[in-house]
Amino acid sequence: MIIWPSYIDKKKSRREGRKVPEELAIEKPSLKDIEKALKKLGLEPKIYRDKRYPRQHWEICGCVEVDYKGNKLQLLKEICKIIKGKN
């Protein structure tokens, strides 16, 4: 499963790729934050810093790959909760 920062970015609209509700979304999520959250969930993420999200192909944002067979939206919500919990 691939996770792009845009999926949980509060500044992005649904059209731009945000998948979680705005109240759960994170301002400027970093690959490092996503990686740490996934590790807290017991998963082993792989970071790809040079990848471009297809909807914003002009900017290099990177992505995270994780071997997860469950519901993607539920995982994204859990990532947001963990990242917000650190603040």
Swiss-Prot record:
Keywords noted in UniProt: Cytoplasm, Ribonucleoprotein, RNA-binding, Signal recognition particle
GO cellular component: signal recognition particle
GO biological process: SRP-dependent cotranslational protein targeting to membrane
InterPro entries linked to this entry: Signal_recog_particle_SRP19 (IPR002778), SRP19-like_sf (IPR036521), SRP19_arc-type (IPR022938)
Record localization: Cytoplasm
This protein's record includes keyword Ribonucleoprotein: yes
Main location as per UniProt: cytoplasm
Pfam families per record: SRP19
Any one GO molecular function term: 7S RNA binding
SUPFAM superfamilies xref list: SRP19
Disulfide bonds: none
Similarity section: Belongs to the SRP19 family.
PANTHER family (alphabetical): SIGNAL RECOGNITION PARTICLE 19 KD PROTEIN, SIGNAL RECOGNITION PARTICLE 19 KDA PROTEIN
Described function: Involved in targeting and insertion of nascent membrane proteins into the cytoplasmic membrane. Binds directly to 7S RNA and mediates binding of the 54 kDa subunit of the SRP.
Subunit structure, as described in the record: Part of the signal recognition particle protein translocation system, which is composed of SRP and FtsY. Archaeal SRP consists of a 7S RNA molecule of 300 nucleotides and two protein subunits: SRP54 and SRP19.
Protein name per its UniProtKB record: Signal recognition particle 19 kDa protein
Natural source organism: Methanocaldococcus jannaschii (strain ATCC 43067 / DSM 2661 / JAL-1 / JCM 10045 / NBRC 100440)
Organism placement in taxonomy: Archaea, Methanobacteriati, Methanobacteriota, Methanomada group, Methanococci
Gene: srp19
